[in-house]
């Protein structure tokens, strides 16, 4: 998808003709809005000169709402009604939210978890919309007019549910979404245009609540994401939790009041940020029961606490490189994104892995918003000379559908460039079949039971035909936002059915890691299972077709032949339930051998019937 606007050489839109579009980084910890002004992307500040808007919303009695820094100051005093890190709950179920250990009262509801506040039960979409509305108003105040749209960034590992939740939040905030853009890709836009760099680059994005690693190939203005990885529940918040656990050793933190837990996390974050520039930092919190928790955290102690968390990010980086078929030495540079990458321990270990000093030319808090602003400006039609780059994102997990025997037919493999459309033809299994069930799945395994179910729908109105005669074309389409739609069409009649995939909740980080790891560790067993299922399906098809043939033309066999076929038919029917692939294959072959002459006689009868009463010249 070339993101180009054609104009006469040297032309540029007049100021009054420019369409106002912004890039928004909807972050876990902080959110920002940026725009291109005088051909330069810049982050927009509020009336107090602050560019970072804390992603915090406090709900008060009477309907009042506090957003940003004001809400953040009250989180320790009113933790249940002050929602922070809401991005972690986008598209999630109540079970996922509770497992995160966040100090809120979660309510299970259809589609997505809700958070209980004094203003009722609110969805993460509604909370995020409050943050987006503030950013929209800030942009309109600074730019002096209404916006035509926004590009909003999301982690590359966000699945369909999380992306759709982000779109819904923007719509609630009165924003027209021009595109959802993967955060690492946004960073690549900012760095690529500034540095005019080419080669293989890694984008290491460690934010407040999510981690993404993307491997990109930059060639002559083309940004191609060739592999992605990450963890949707790993970020700066987890480093804060590690500090709390260390400072409160021997204390059952989970049993403390919510206000105390929130105060501990606030103190931990302050200590973590102080250690960026200092050798040690104080950790002091007075609990509601009067007890004081005091500690001094050194940088060495923090690095020890952080090591397993940083190690998880490096494991993801190694997996992404393997997916791309690259070695560490192939990477020309590493772009650092996200406020958590300011931690010296992160920069040191990332540099050690890749053997190069990470790139930190641009503010890691702002780089994603700047890249999104450039993309938004382009999509709005405000193209300037030289802005002729192309974005190629990828999907993180394979997409396919269920076939006979519970097998997965992979339609779009993981790491395929998006937007993408792939189609494949299927047929009916039984004579006279007039409907087909389409089961869409996501994952890397060969069996449907080992993959994630995304959607089901039925195609009805298939003309009755013999098994295998109908042609049903199934098309998978993934748009530039990573959202999937599936269409099934019967070719002769044009009858069609479709579904837009919006799963009720997203994958947890553990599920994502398991799906990718299992595809490697279970490869041999999956191959054996596929072979067995395929043989079982073949046995079932042969048993059904032979049974139908005997019912129609059984008189073509003499008693001895019929007895042999019946015996082989029964053996093949019983073999369908066996777990021995060779035994099933042998039973199928035996039945095929026993019915070979029978099939020839049926063919002769069919030909004679077709020729009966016809003259030779009619066949010429």
Swiss-Prot record:
Instruction: Tell me the keywords, alphabetical order.
Output: ATP-binding, Chaperone, Nucleotide-binding
Keyword Zinc carried by entry? no
Q: Name one GO biological process term.
A: iron-sulfur cluster assembly
Q: Which InterPro entries match?
A: ATPase_NBD (IPR043129), Heat_shock_70_CS (IPR018181), HSP70_C_sf (IPR029048), HSP70_peptide-bd_sf (IPR029047), Hsp_70_fam (IPR013126), ISC_FeS_clus_asmbl_HscA (IPR010236)
State if Nucleotide-binding is listed as a keyword. yes
Stored Pfam families: HSP70 (PF00012)
Q: What terms describe the molecular function in GO for this protein?
A: ATP binding; ATP hydrolysis activity; ATP-dependent protein folding chaperone; unfolded protein binding
Q: Which PANTHER family match?
A: HEAT SHOCK PROTEIN 70KDA
Q: Give the protein family.
A: Belongs to the heat shock protein 70 family.
Q: What does this protein do?
A: Chaperone involved in the maturation of iron-sulfur cluster-containing proteins. Has a low intrinsic ATPase activity which is markedly stimulated by HscB.
What NCBIfam families is this protein classified in? HscA, PRK05183.1
Kindly provide the name given to this protein in its UniProt entry. Answer: Chaperone protein HscA homolog
Q: Which organism is this protein's natural source?
A: Bordetella bronchiseptica (strain ATCC BAA-588 / NCTC 13252 / RB50)
Gene name of this polypeptide: hscA
